């Protein structure tokens, strides 16, 4: 089994979130916790099927892309795919992958330009081992549908738009079929959006144990401190959106569709502050409580 973490932390650089300067890739708290969970669930990293709900910018997509990059470097003929919700987000994710590769080449003293047989805005192909890494944008033409893939990351899936040509469900379902059953890695990762979208439905299916994907939730408290989150929330227009972007629990991560009659914030407060019952039982016909 490959030591993904060892390779990533020893050879990959990433742009520091605060300084935007290159720094050695060191797993943060969420990345460390998630990687440990993956090791426990999938000892050989095969048949990985994960749906991740989290607060903003906790590093989940970064660590998944880094793992795919390790496969690009070390697994001959592997095919990794990343699909994001917007063109600009897709481009940024691909730049991150290329930054990993550039730092790896620098550490290994390999000419970066010699690493690729093909290198364009959507696809890179390894010059010697035949591995490929493809990126696409949800709603655009999804490449390689007829072929097979080793790894797929669906990034910010809750924000995939349903169009007349293709729905979010069709994008994920059709593309995921490229990975053979019980093989490879598929991640569906996102912050929450609406209670009536595909991602929410798939999340609820996973929570009920009706999906092949295992649900993981990482709230803001696993990465940020309370003072930082409160300050960040002031940049957002309302409390509901702030809770969706930085949820403390799963219930805060999705906005109810439409305009609910009852205020969700008050309902949540009532639930959290409810009195515990004095006793629990049944009232019989004779008036006895049992």
Give a label for each model feature:
Residues 1-290:
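Phosphate/NTP-binding elements of NTP-utilizing enzymes
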